[in-house]
């Protein structure tokens, strides 16, 4: 069905829940002659088989609550320091904790840390730059940042750390 309408649509939204789904979707698109942009969720990070369909793989863009730039100088410095101090490698979960702690410490800086003051400062939309994602809340209580990632020539690359809302 998609092949019959592929010349009238811009792309296809294909979220996955298992890394092996990526290869199945990509190969089916190639076999069916469907040459569309693919939009998905962060589970595409776990995908396998990108190399079997490079032209189609290069059309993949997805959102994610994390993106780690392993080539970033600040990340490399932090990772080395963390390994030397804690004796373990930095991973995604460690970065979630580190970025959250950095956010909380930034929130309570320069205020009397009462519940009310903390709430107001969080709702003010203060932005904190993190290694896995930027963090900013308002009175909706959800992080306003989402990473937009694409797969290009065998590498996942950050397109933007997009901030929604006001």
Regions found by a protein language model. Name each.
Residues 1-166:
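Extracytosolic ligand-binding ectodomains
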């Amino acid at each position: 069905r998609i092949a019959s309408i592929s010349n009238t649509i811009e792309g296809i939204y294909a979220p996955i829940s298992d890394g092996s789904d990526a290869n199945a979707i990509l190969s089916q698109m190639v076999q069916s002659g469907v040459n569309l942009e693919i939009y998905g969720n962060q589970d595409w990070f776990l995908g396998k088989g990108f190399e079997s369909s490079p032209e189609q793989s290069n059309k993949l863009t997805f959102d994610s609550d994390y993106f780690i730039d392993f080539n970033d100088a600040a990340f490399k410095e932090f990772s080395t320091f963390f390994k030397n101090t804690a004796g373990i490698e930095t991973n995604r979960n460690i970065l979630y904790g580190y970025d959250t702690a950095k956010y909380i410490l930034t929130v309570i800086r320069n205020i009397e840390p009462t519940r009310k003051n903390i709430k107001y400062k969080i709702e003010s939309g203060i932005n904190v730059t993190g290694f896995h994602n930027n963090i900013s809340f308002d009175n909706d209580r959800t992080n306003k940042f989402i990473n937009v990632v694409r797969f290009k020539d065998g590498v996942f690359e950050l397109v933007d750390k997009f901030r929604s809302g006001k």
